[in-house]
Amino acid sequence: MESAYLHKFLGTCLTEGLAELARMRPVDPIEYLALWIYKYKKNVTMEKQRQEEMAQLEHEREVALMEQEMMERLRAEELLFQQQQLEFQLELEEQEKERQRIEELERAQEQFEKELRMSMENMAKEDTLHGEDGADSGKTLAEISDRYGAPNLSRVEELDEPMLSDVALNIDQDL
């Protein structure tokens, strides 16, 4: 049982220590073996500590990479958010401009309708003042159509045209 324990827990250490003892052949082999085992244990502890530190450093490196990726994602999200805010603000400005343009058009339409009503009222007043006699007082169709909203008709002067009977007489004379 003691040999199994020694073999299991001290096998490699004792084997290497005895091999070193045989190679060096010190004056006091027991003291040399004790110091060698002490140094072996110290080296094993240092190696274990170094591996733990390496594992810790690897873990910290992974955490740093994850934090860096998270920061990049946050920056990307922030840029996207800023871009969306800018687009939203531009859209609001466009809507405001469109609303102002519509209000301006409505005001212009109201002004136009007001002027049209006033013009119609003025025409109605003129018609009532002149009466129906005034309408037959010699105004031509072109003069009547000069009012606001009436079609623009050009004046046509009448030329003296020969009558059909005059043309027939001329033909008879030629024969």
Swiss-Prot record:
Top-level division of the source organism's lineage: Eukaryota
Entry's localization field: Cytoplasm, Cytoskeleton, Flagellum axoneme
Family matches, as Gene3D superfamilies: cAMP-dependent protein kinase regulatory subunit, dimerization-anchoring domain
Entries under InterPro entries matching the protein: Dpy-30_motif (IPR007858), DYDC-like_DD (IPR049630), Sdc1/DPY30 (IPR037856)
Entry's Gene Ontology cellular component terms: motile cilium; radial spoke; Set1C/COMPASS complex
PANTHER family with a match to the protein in the record: DPY30 DOMAIN-CONTAINING PROTEIN 1, DPY30-RELATED
Record-given protein name: DPY30 domain-containing protein 1
Encoding gene per record: DYDC1
